[in-house]
Amino acid sequence: MKPKNFPLARYVLGAMLAFLFVGVAQAQTETTSIAEVTYAINNLFLLAAAVLVLFMQAGFAMLEAGLSSHKNTVNVLFKNTFDVCVGVLLYFLFGYSLMYGENPVLGGFFGWGGFGITNNLDNVEGLSPQVDWLFQAAFAATAATIVSGAVMGRMYFKAYLIYSAVITGLVYPISGHWKWGGGWLDKLGFHDFAGSLLVHSVGGFAALAAVVVMGPRIGRFEGNKINSLGYQGITSSSLGVFILWVGWYGFNPGSQLAFVGALNTNTTMLIAVNTTLSAAAGGLAALAFDWITENKRKPNLLVTLNGILGGLVGITAGCDTVSNWSAIAIGVVAGILSVLGTKLLDRLRIDDGVGAWPVHGLCGIWGGIAVGIFSTNVEHKLSAQIVGSLVIPFWAFITMFFLFYVMDLWGILRVKPSQEKVGLDIVEHGQTEKGVEIAFED
């Protein structure tokens, strides 16, 4: 007996198999599309953050130019410009590799992965190595430019060129490797989310080393009297601080390194709010503390501006892991420290032109320690935070002190008194801020 034919059944079975294959192919396509969109959004997020951090250079330039005298404006702006140019190139050549190289050198003192952006670097999964480098290079330039305002009116431009190259190409990447490159501080459990210590205290203590070696500007201290020496534009400085504040939304939220997904999105928003609260609290705390403790002192705008910056620096280490209320407390302490640090420098007759050490150095240390006090993550131990908060500033100060001391011995660090009185715009660059070119011979 011949088997019966079931043409309808065959058609139905064929249709079901075809539908199944189409469904699988469509699911694979949708999965691929979701992955590609996630990749694109996260990389675009980090690119935008990198641009904001790079734009902070404009904030530093405006802040420092406003606090300088008319005769040193071009010099201050030139140094900020140079920091970006030399910073990105040296960080590309070998700084990035020293910081994130997968091959440990000298027992993990720093890493190495070859020159430029190579495949031997500890790149973040899901990010283009190119945009990861761009974000990190903007950080490196930030660490370098902190010193610019502190040394205003005193340092030879050639000495600043040497300093900027050394801190960007060597000092910052090496200490950065200890934490962000997976080095010994990372293994210890030290937490510095966006660089209270790795960026700001490095720059702040480099500034302290510079001003200690060079000494104060002519006329800054006369007996018990402290002279301001004048500044040209409080408007410029105020604008600079607000540019820095806006740039910090690339600095801190950008350090999450991803935006897609509920966890990444919520953490990014927490970081942004904590950054805002700490900055505001720092400004008000500095204003109130200075106003109350200084007899007959009127409310001081510059003190408030530095308090805002202190609050921003202080929250940078733990902005991802503390509550909103803790962020306010961190900002309050940072604002007070910015005032106390300035008073301490004045008492010691140390001339920091913009308060770089109180704001970035001292508040950077506080930011690291604050993680151990306020973090909601039980793995963030106070002991590890204290170690990192002492070692990183010590590294920056010792290396930079040695560099500045050697340059001072060579006679290439501080300008002559006659040159300082004329101003570095004319002495070093032969032009004024108005664009007038003037020859100078000493």
Curated annotation (Swiss-Prot):
It is found in: Cell membrane. It is a multi-pass membrane protein. The keyword Transmembrane applies. Signal peptide: none annotated. The keyword Kinase does not apply. GO terms for cellular component: plasma membrane. It comes from the Bacteria. The chain crosses the membrane at residues 5-25, 44-64, 81-101, 104-124, 133-153, 155-175, 193-213, 240-260, 269-289, 299-319, 325-345, 354-374, 386-406. GO terms for molecular function: ammonium channel activity. Pfam families: Ammonium_transp. Gene3D superfamilies: Ammonium transporter AmtB like domains. Keywords: Ammonia transport, Cell membrane, Membrane, Transmembrane, Transmembrane helix, Transport. PROSITE patterns: AMMONIUM_TRANSP. Belongs to the ammonia transporter channel (TC 1.A.11.2) family. This is Putative ammonium transporter sll1017.
